[in-house]
Amino acid sequence: MNAMQPPQSIEEIKAGLETTEKGGVRQSIRNCLTVFQCDPLLSGAIAYNILTDRKDIIKPIGFHRESTALNDTDMKYLLLYLEETYGLTNEKKIDNAIGIVANENKYHPIRDYLNTRVWDGTERIRFCLRHFLGADADDYTYEALKLFLLGAISRAFQPGCKFEIMLCLVGGQGAGKSTFFRLLAVRDEWFSDDLRKLDDDNVYRKLQGHWIIEMSEMMATANAKSIEEIKSFLSRQKEVYKIPYETHPADRPRQCVFGGTSNALDFLPLDRSGNRRFIPVMVYPEQAEVHILEDEAASRAYIEQMWAEAMEIYRSGRFKLAFSSAMQRYLKEHQRDFMPEDTKAGMIQAYLDKYTGSMVCSKQLYKEALNHAFDEPKQWEIREINEIMNQSIDRWRYFPNPRMFSEYGRQKGWERENPATDSGNPSEKTMDGFVEVTEQMELPF
C-alpha cells in the first residue's frame, strides 16, 4: 500500500470505489483507504508522529484547527466529509483506515529539525554554559554539556538507547537554569517540568511527546531514598504502557533525557559509592555574558547552532555516551562539593594521618578513630567503615586475606601504600615518612 499516491479528482475516486450488489458504495476499509490516499484534500494529510505516539494532521484540510494532533473534533469533520462526499459512513472502518494511512506516513519532528540544521563552524558547546549561566569554561563543563546533547540526539534517533545521565545545574534562584532547559528543547511542547512522581503507573503520559524533561522539585527535596529512586528511574530505557484505546500494552522506548536544577549546593545526599548518573555544574549568574532571556531570539539562534554543532559530532560517530575514565575520576571528586560533609570519613582520615602503623582493620577504626573504645560495632557500622575506606580514603589498599592484629585478632583490613619509616617522632611523621621540621625544633648539626 502507498499512503502517498498522487491525488485524483473526486469523480475519479468515486468511480474507482468498490460497490455493493445494489450499486451503493461498499462500507469497507479498502474504500476508506482509497479516499485518504487519493482525495485532493486528504492525501498526505494524516501522519503518525513517532515522538508523540499519536496521529497528526499535518496540512490544512478545510477547517480551523488549534494543534496538529488529531482530536475528536477533527474526527467529526472527517466523518462529515466522507459521508457527504463519498457516502462512507462506517465510523469503525474509517478509523481503521486512518490508522493504516497514518502508519504508512510516519515522521519524527525532532529528527526533521536536527537533520536540517547547518553548522556555521563556530564552536559554541564549549562556551554555552559560561555564556548564559556563568559556569566555568573548563573541560569538565564542556564534556558535561556535550554528553547531555549527544544523549538527547541519540534518544531522538535511537529511542530507548542506554543513557542514564542527568545534567544538574546548581546555583542561585533567578539564574535562568530552568529557562536554559526549556530553550534547549527548541519548542516549548518538547519541554516539560511536570514530572512529580516516579512511581506513577501513568508516568509514560508525562514523558510522551517531550524531549527535555526538567526535574526541579524532586532534586530540591532529594534524600538518600529518593535519590535511589531517581537513579533507578534514569536507568530505564522504556516504559510498558497501554494507551486507553488500545487492547494490549506495548513497550514505549524513551525518547527523552532528564535535566536537574537545584538552588541548594549540597543537593546530593551522601553516597560514598558515587552518584555517577548526576553531573553537577555550578552556575554563577553574575559572571554570565548575557541573561538567557535578555534577547530570547538571539539565545534561541545560539542554541540552534549548538544543536547543529552537536549533530556534526553525532554524524561522525566519534563519541561515547559516557565520560572517559579520567573524567569519571574527576566527576567523583567534584560531586563531593555537592554532598553534605562526610564527618565519619573526616574522623577516619584524621586518625590515619597521625597513625604510624602500616595496616588497620575496621574494628580498630571503629574503636580508635570513631571513639567507640568500649563498644562493639554492629554489622552495618562495619560495612559503613569499609565503604569509607574503599571509596573515600586514598593511599590505603584493601587486603582480603586476614592478618593478625595484636588487639583485634585475625582481621581483613587495609595496608598503607607508602609505609612510614620508624625513625624520629612517630606522632609527627608525614604520609611519606618524613618528619616536618618546625621553627621550634633544634637541628642536630
Identify what each model region corresponds to.
Residues M1-R124, E143, D375-E376, W380, ...:
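N-terminal nucleic-acid engagement/recognition segments and initiation subdomains in replication
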Residues I98-Q208:
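P-loop NTPase catalytic core of nucleic-acid-dependent motor ATPases
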Residues I212-L234, P269-G274:
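Conserved AAA+/SF3 P-loop NTPase catalytic/coupling segment centered on the Walker-B
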Residues S362-F374:
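DNA-recognition alpha helix
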